Amino acid sequence: MEAILKIGDIVENKYQIEKLLNRGGMDSYLFLAKNLNLKNYGPVQKKQYGHLVLKVVQKNPKINENNWKKFLDEMVTTTRVHHSNLVKSFDVVNPFLKIVRGNKTIALNQIVMIAMEYVDGPSLRQLLNRKGYFSVSEVVYYFTKIVKAIDYLHSFKHQIIHRDLKPENILFTSDLTDIKLLDFGIASTVVKVAEKTEVLTDENSLFGTVSYMIPDVLESTVNKAGKKVRKPPNAQYDIYSLGIILFEMLVGRVPFNKSINPNKERETIQKARNFDLPLMQATRSDIPNSLENIAFRCTAVKRENNKWLYSSTKELLEDLANWENEQAMIKPANERVLEGQVEIREMMLEKPLAWYFKTWALSIFTIVFIGLIIAAIVLLLIFNARF
């Protein structure tokens, strides 16, 4: 894909490629491009839209024509989605792309290109790496904007589920006063494709990022034809991801010990089904119960906690609006089953009691033995000093 567009290429006589920025969802590539179509723009617009991001996606051979057509239709839909906290899409070109490279004109087929707003600030991931975590007031301010953007997508006439919410897809403006969500178009389309896709055993077929994926992504259902298919996603897919992001913004890490082993992705994703969310107050004493409860309700996918799980982003926004009100903890610390506690318990059960006595006895013997050696050396030094 990197060879398809090169620095200096002029795309559709509108955009000139300046550099490759990054990889995106669905094996797409993001390029920074100069906007050559600014004749009718005023000074402010020229400054704002002088550079755009071009997202380029080439048709995957595994996607059939019907699903590819749906994908193209959804890309056009993204240009109609307008919210202050969503990256704007201005232009969609498909399925042919015309490139001028030097004296050559190249025509590419089975490609879709989306021209999007360029946000020149850092991502949430970059800020987390730099700051560690945010203050409570900062979190409420930014997180509310993120949730409002997702609520808008969920309220759209063809409900759009993002499905890949993570700090890398949350961008800040250069002055850090606002945020923009990225990749909502790509993710929503995959939802439609996934509903008709058979459940695959290949771990890489899972769409999203493991640390932010709700365990429901592993569940399947049987369609009218008796075929096993993936369970259609719903609003709680994004709500769960929001809870993980809220936790990470306040604490600086994801809640579960999710060391990503490519061979154990399913086991990692299931952890939220088996363990409770750790209390953030164990790390920071200034976190109010209200935010503890919001994070808990977003991620309450453990069977016994389902009664607290948010059913919509509107419920979440109501709680965010009242975050300063005093409230009791929904599930106190002594009632939560935490990942680390269970691992220690399981480790102890794997070893017989005699093994622990033997280990402790050996440790005590070693300490006493070393102490005697040190004492002997000290006495010897004292003796030599006197005589």
Swiss-Prot record:
One of its GO terms (cellular component) is plasma membrane. Residues 15-344 form the Protein kinase domain. GO terms for molecular function: ATP binding; protein serine kinase activity; protein serine/threonine kinase activity. The keyword Transferase applies. Its main location: membrane. It is an enzyme of class 2 (transferase). GO terms for biological process: signal transduction. This is Putative serine/threonine-protein kinase. It comes from Mycoplasma genitalium (strain ATCC 33530 / DSM 19775 / NCTC 10195 / G37).
